Amino acid sequence: HSIPEMIRNYPGVEYVITANGGAVYSVREGKRVYQCLLEKESVESAIAVRKRENMVLEVVIDGVPYAEEAYVKDPIQYLATEYGAKYIKATRKPVKDICRFAQKHAEELDSISFVCRYEDKERLYTSLDKEIPNIYVTSSVPNLMEVGHIDAGKGKTLLWLLKKLEISTEEAMAFGDADNDISMLTSVKYGMAMGNGTENCRKAAPYVTDTNEKDGVAKGILRFLSEVE
C-alpha cells in the first residue's frame, strides 16, 4: 500500500483512511477493516473516458497504486511538483497498458485518478459526473481528478470509523487542506482547514487554523483543549 512507513509507525496512529475514503486499515492488525470498491460498470465507463481523453490514469488495488510507465518515470512532465514526483516514484507501480490492467481488475479497484491539466479539470469533472454511474468525484491536488464509489469519501468513511470506535462527531477533530477533505471536515464538530488549504476547503470548514509550516495542527488542537480546560 502507499501508506508511508513514518505514518504506520507513528505513536498513536491506529487506523488509516486511504483512497479518499475507499478503505480503512488497522495499523495494529496490519490489514484492511473496511472497503467501498468501485463498481465494474463504473470502471468500464472510466476506461472509456480515459481512451477518449488520452489522459494518464492511476488505479488503486488493495491500497497499492498503479500508473502508466511514462508517468511514473517522469511525473514532473505531467505537472507534478518536485515533492509529488518523489512520492509518485516511490509509491506507484508502473504498468504498460493501464486500460487493459484496469479492465482485468475491474471488480477490485479502490479508486481511479485522472492526471490532467488544471484548465481541463472543470470539463473533465462534468464528463465524469455525467458519464460514470455511482461515483464520487473529488480532487486533492491541481492536476488530479479522483474517482471513488458513491458511498466513499473521507467524510462518510470517517463516520463509519467513529461509529466503530463509539466516538461521537461532537468529540471528533479533523484537519485537511484540499477539496477532497471537505466532507471530512464538515462531518465532525471540530473540522479545521489548514491556513494554506484550498479556497474551497477553507470556506467549507467550520474552523481555519494556521498553515502546515506554522504548526497549524498543534495550534488547532491546543485552541480547543484550552476551552475544555
Language-model segments: what does each one mean?
Residues I3, V43, K121, Y125, ...:
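A general structural signal for well-ordered alpha-helical segments in protein cores
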Residues V13-A19, Q77-L79, Y136-T138, G191-G195, ...:
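Short hydrophobic/aromatic-enriched beta-strand-loop microsegments
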Residues H1-L79:
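Active-site phosphate-binding/coordination module
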Residues E39, F114-R117, A178, E213-K214:
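Short beta->alpha junction loops/turns
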